[in-house]
């Protein structure tokens, strides 16, 4: 079952050695089944054979990594090669010709993608950025046209080139062309700026959908070590033509969920990773069967350390039926090392927490970089230096306010943050964990102010135990919100990802427009698409910057003309959130039909 998809550089991954992993300090109940086999020296299932099928030496396009979960809960990573992102130009003025298409291709090489460098050649005559080009006819989704238009389609060797070209040609709506009328060629860039969406649409796969592969080029049993580039149980290479969706398999593979929360010693204001240490990492490991978290089999773990000669950590308050495992380290670096070992052993599919995207995970990654602990620098299933540094994200709201935050990528693992999830579906006076837990769970947070954390940690073993219980309580509340019947976040993400055919990571951070666009692109591939089998493309649009002076006014709703469609022919609507769906249903009409009739 597909968990995540990412695109990396064009370098083909070479065969790796897979030494036996060291024995984990954790019991079998915390370890994934496949990892447990490796620790005991038992073999596991191989995918395909050892022989590598080398790609075309002149075509080393981007590698697409598919992360998934097998029915036995083991993780798998497949490198897919041979799929190239495409960039399209719609010809809205002038005459399309192969000569013009080639001239624009040369312009792309020399100006749009050259970045001041001389384009290198594959075999003496093929440019580096463009793999191939072709002319085709297709429909434009916006603006709507009754007849297909001419398009130039370019297959690119780099995934990031798609968005670069789209942004470049948006600023150049016309180009000089001696063969077109008036010597001017009008163009509109069309593209999914996300090359992974192109791959998923072309392959017919969806988020959390089942995928099969044939002719696996090579496979590796992941007898993992801390130096490997991937921590999955199985790895292999395959051509993109061998990827097939399994549409008749509706089951949801068991998912490994990990709730997480951290506590830091803060000075004034928010803590900073380069100065303020992490003193406690609280984690709850559990499983989600058919998208529903199993509440009866949760493992509570506390990672902590204490000042030298301070007496360690006292007995953590707990209920009679509750068990808590405490991993007490000598210092912060040793605590991070133990936590990294736990991540490798348990191999979670989903992280859950309140503001885990905006604080906990970026802070852990940044702090691990400061301490030099490899195991936590990469909280995803891919270990490379380029993925270890959190990125600064700037969001602009409708009122013009901007907000900056850090985000750490975790390839192969989903970050399910209860804070933005609830903000998108509920309107609350306060979105703090305490307020939300009190309203939906009937249970509030323990009252420990941030200014009290430092003194309590230094005071005594008993006060440190109180902080550990406080941290673990936050993890429980976050998981409680994720499992609450009002949200059912894991099941909601799984089913919505399958329905909209959008991968989970993109689903959680994008709006409704991306969902609708992906649905239309997938539907346009079906043989019964009206009016023909030609593809449908969306133009690339740059987001318009907003200022505080912008004013927003609600739309005026007008009743459409009756009789645009027969009453025995129902229609489907795809509006986001407005009155139009109810108007369409009551009058059995659409605004597009009325527009066509009037013109």
Feature locations, PLM:
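Long, charged/polar, low-complexity intrinsically disordered N-terminal extensions
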Residues: 1-153
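N-terminal accessory regions of nucleic-acid-interacting proteins
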Residues: 2-23, 29-31, 129, 138, ...
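Common nucleic-acid-contacting/processivity interface regions adjacent to the catalytic cores
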Residues: 4, 216, 454-598
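Short helix/loop capping segments that flank catalytic or ligand/cofactor-binding pockets
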Residues: 165, 267-269, 292-293, 362, ...
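Short secondary-structure boundary/capping segments
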Residues: 170-171, 273-278, 360-375, 380, ...
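Alpha-helical interaction scaffolds
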Residues: 203-256, 262-336, 340-344
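Active-site-proximal helix-loop-helix substrate-binding element of RNase H-like nuclease domains
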Residues: 298-303, 307-326, 330, 347, ...
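Proline-aspartate-enriched helix->loop->beta-strand connector
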Residues: 339-363
């Amino acid at each position: 079952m597909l968990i995540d998809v990412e695109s990396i550089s064009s370098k083909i991954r070479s065969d790796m050695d897979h030494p036996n992993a060291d024995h984990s300090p954790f019991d079998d109940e915390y370890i994934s089944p496949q990892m447990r086999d490796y620790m005991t020296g038992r073999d596991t299932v191989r995918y395909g054979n050892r022989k590598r099928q080398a790609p075309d030496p002149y075509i080393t396009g981007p590698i697409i990594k598919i992360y998934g979960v097998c029915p036995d809960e083991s993780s798998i990573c497949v490198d897919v090669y041979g799929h190239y992102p495409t960039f399209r130009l719609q010809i809205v003025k002038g005459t399309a010709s192969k000569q013009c298409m080639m001239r624009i291709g040369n312009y792309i090489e020399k100006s749009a993608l050259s970045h001041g460098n001389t384009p290198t050649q594959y075999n003496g005559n093929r440019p580096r950025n463009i793999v191939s080009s072709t002319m085709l006819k297709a429909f434009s989704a916006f603006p709507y046209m009754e007849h297909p238009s001419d398009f130039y389609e370019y297959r690119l060797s780099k995934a990031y080139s798609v968005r670069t070209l789209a942004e470049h040609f948006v600023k150049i709506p016309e180009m000089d062309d001696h063969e077109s009328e008036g010597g001017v060629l009008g163009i509109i860039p069309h593209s999914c700026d996300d090359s992974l969406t192109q791959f998923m649409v072309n392959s017919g796969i969806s988020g959390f959908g089942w995928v099969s592969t044939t002719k696996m080029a090579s496979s590796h049993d992941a007898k993992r070590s801390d130096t490997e580039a991937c921590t999955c149980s199985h790895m292999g290479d395959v051509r993109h033509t061998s990827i097939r969706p399994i549409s008749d398999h509706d089951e949801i593979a068991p998912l490994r969920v990990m709730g997480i929360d951290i506590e830091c010693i803060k000075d004034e204001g928010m803590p900073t990773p380069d100065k303020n240490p992490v003193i406690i990492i609280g984690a709850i490991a559990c499983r989600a069967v058919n998208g529903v978290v199993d509440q009866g089999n949760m493992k509570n773990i506390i990672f902590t350390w204490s000042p030298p000669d301070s007496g360690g950590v006292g007995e953590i308050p707990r209920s009679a039926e509750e068990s808590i495992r405490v991993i007490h380290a000598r210092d912060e670096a040793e605590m991070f090392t133990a936590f990294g070992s736990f991540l490798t052993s348990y191999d979670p599919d989903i992280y859950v927490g309140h503001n885990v995207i905006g604080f906990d995970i970026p802070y852990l990654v940044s702090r691990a970089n400061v301490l030099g602990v490899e195991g936590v620098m990469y909280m995803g299933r891919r270990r490379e230096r380029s993925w270890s540094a959190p990125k600064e994200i700037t969001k602009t709201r409708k009122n013009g306010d901007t907000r900056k935050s850090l985000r750490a990528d975790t390839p192969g693992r989903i970050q399910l943050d209860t804070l933005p999830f609830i903000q998108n579906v509920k309107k609350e006076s306060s979105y703090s964990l305490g307020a939300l837990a009190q309203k939906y769970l009937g249970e509030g947070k323990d009252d420990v102010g941030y200014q009290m954390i430092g003194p309590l940690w230094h005071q005594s073993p008993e006060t440190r135990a109180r902080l550990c219980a406080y941290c673990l309580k936050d993890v429980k509340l976050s998981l409680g919100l994720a499992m609450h019947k009002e949200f059912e976040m894991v099941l909601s993400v799984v089913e919505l990802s399958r329905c909209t055919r959008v991968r989970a990571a993109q689903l959680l951070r994008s709006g409704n427009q991306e969902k609708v666009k992906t649905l239309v692109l997938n539907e346009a591939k079906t043989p019964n698409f009206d009016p023909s089998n030609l593809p449908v493309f969306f133009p690339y649009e740059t987001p318009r910057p907003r200022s505080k002076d912008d004013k927003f006014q609600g739309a005026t709703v007008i009743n459409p003309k009756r009789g645009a469609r027969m009453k025995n022919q129902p229609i489907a609507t795809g509006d986001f959130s407005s009155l139009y769906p109810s108007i369409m249903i009551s009058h059995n009409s659409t605004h597009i039909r009325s527009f066509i009739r009037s013109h």
